[in-house]
Amino acid sequence: ALVTAIEPKAYTDGHPKVRLLFPNVQATEKEYFKKTGVFPIMHAVAVRKDFAEAHPSLPKAMFSLYSRAKQVAYKDLETVGVLKVTLPWVNQELDDTRALMGDNYWKYGVEANRKELELVMRYTHEQGLVKRRLRVEEIFHPSTLKLTET
């Protein structure tokens, strides 16, 4: 199984051994979110621990910059005078997403994503990818644990 936002070439080329795990991915993901409140995390930003410790203001500054950039992207998507993508129902899709997930549908920060992160820790242990179940606090620099968006 492959979890990805972009369909692999083998799938788009119609390879007979490559198929979707769920026939209607969007409906399945939305139903899972309704039941669990979990939407898989898409990305994480990594900085070497020694570098973060040598530059103690860096983690917070990076978090702040990414948060501000996200707000710019949100505002850009909300601009309806000129569509940002050539999809006829993009505004309705944005409205539907907000109705389901709230205005901040890509949440930043450890606490805002704790449920998702704990599931990742559980799954990586259950699937044998790590020898012991890690705690969320073990994989993030201490200075980032309480950062929240403003």
Q: What are the residue ranges of the model-derived segments?
A:
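Long, low-complexity C-terminal extensions of enzymes
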Residues: 109-150
